[in-house]
Amino acid sequence: MLARSLKKYFPVLSISFCILAFTIFLPLKEVFPLTRTAEGIVSEVTDGDTIKLETKEGTKLKIRLYGLDAPESPKFNRKTGRINKPGQAFGKEAGDVLVSKILGKKVKVDVLGIDRYDRMVSIVWLGDRNINLEMVREGMAEAYKEYLRAPLRAQFLEAETEARISKRGIWSLSEYQRPSEFRKSQKIRG
């Protein structure tokens, strides 16, 4: 009876296994079939994980860096210039590091999806440098485990482990609060 059931489902199981194997070993665009690429100049760095990109056509795109969650930077009242929501340790530094890497520079983004705030969730490339991974490796952000998918998941987790062991950036703190937990405690949207 079991052998008959296995024979019946063998083609389905075989195809499922092949799909899984291809998913693990295919390039990014094959794994994320909706991946689109855009190029432009980084016109603004909002914080350690969000930028604005202006394409050569003049289109302005809001980009959320995929795979990382940077500490929250302070939020300022535009009229008064005063802080109306506090930031986290390394929040400002994470933004400053991202500014030094890409502000005013031409980058390519691989858009993997759209988040609930209508930002394009993307991998940001400066030449052959994966800026997202660099931010995690330097301890300026944690790997955003809740949203990581194969095949990139392993790279981001490895980069975070390297930063933790070396006590870089956020991992040098004696007490660290995840940005997602901080946002909940401060009622800040992500």
Describe the residue ranges of each PLM region.
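N-terminal Lys/Arg-rich, disordered targeting/topogenic segments
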Residues: 1-10
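Hydrophobic membrane-insertion alpha-helices, especially the h-region
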Residues: 11-24
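Short, surface-exposed, charged/polar-biased interaction segments
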Residues: 27, 63, 86, 119, ...
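Electropositive
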Residues: 28-146
